[in-house]
Regions:
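Central regulatory/effector-binding core of bacterial HTH transcription factors
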Residues: 1-29, 98-101
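A local structural motif
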Residues: 1-2, 87-97
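Alpha-helical segments flanking ligand/cofactor-binding loops in enzyme cores
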Residues: 11-12, 63, 106-107, 156
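Alpha-to-beta junction loops
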Residues: 14-23, 44, 91, 109-116
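Secondary-structure junction motif
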Residues: 25, 62, 68-91, 151-159
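Beta-alpha-beta core module
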Residues: 30-37, 41-43, 103-150
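Flexible hinge/capping segments at coil-to-helix
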Residues: 32-44, 48-70, 153-156
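Extended ligand-binding regions for polar small-molecule ligands
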Residues: 58, 63, 144-166
Length: 166
């Protein structure tokens, strides 16, 4: 099964033994886990309506987003990362909503709630436009599993494959 949720929810399921292996987006505390860092980095930007005043920009700076209603991820560690990117401008941010899955955020953008800060996706949202952040903000990912856990043969082989691949 593939299960989508925030890193915090997924780690909780791993601790309970419901999930064996997880792809976790950083920033994330992985002290309890063995992991392999994925080579691809994700780039942050804003998902905006095509008719937004921001839609004509090639990139967005903290000053461009100041005073605009913003939709951000609900994870505190991600919010802290974004606060660091915004710097002194963070105090001027208007946080309109938070999200746990990008599809929810895209629907909020579509309905005029604000611009969603998110990773660049291969998905096309028709009437929405992704605009990269400048200065560039990147996030990594790790494939993680509990230390010293006994896995099924299939899970063990998959972990070994991942270790050998990256």
């Amino acid at each position: 099964d593939i299960y989508s949720a925030t890193a915090d929810d997924i780690k909780e399921r791993m601790e309970k033994g419901i999930l064996d292996i997880a792809l976790l987006m950083e920033p994330v505390d992985i002290g309890k886990y063995e992991f392999v860092r994925m080579p691809q980095r994700e780039h942050w930007g804003a998902l905006v309506c095509a008719d937004s005043p921001l839609a004509d920009k090639e990139t967005l700076s903290p000053d461009d987003l100041a005073g605009q209603p913003i939709i951000i991820a609900k994870r505190e560690s991600v919010q802290n990362e974004l606060a660091n990117w915004f710097g002194d401008t963070y105090d001027k941010m208007e946080i309109a909503a938070t999200y746990n899955l990008i599809l929810n955020a895209a629907n909020m953008v579509r309905n005029g709630v604000g611009a969603a800060l998110c990773f660049q996706m291969d998905n096309r949202y028709g009437d929405l436009r992704f605009i990269p952040l400048r200065p560039r903000l990147e996030t990594g990912a790790v494939l993680a599993w509990k230390k010293n856990q006994t896995f099924s043969e299939t899970s063990s082989q998959f972990i070994q494959f991942i270790k050998n691949s990256f």
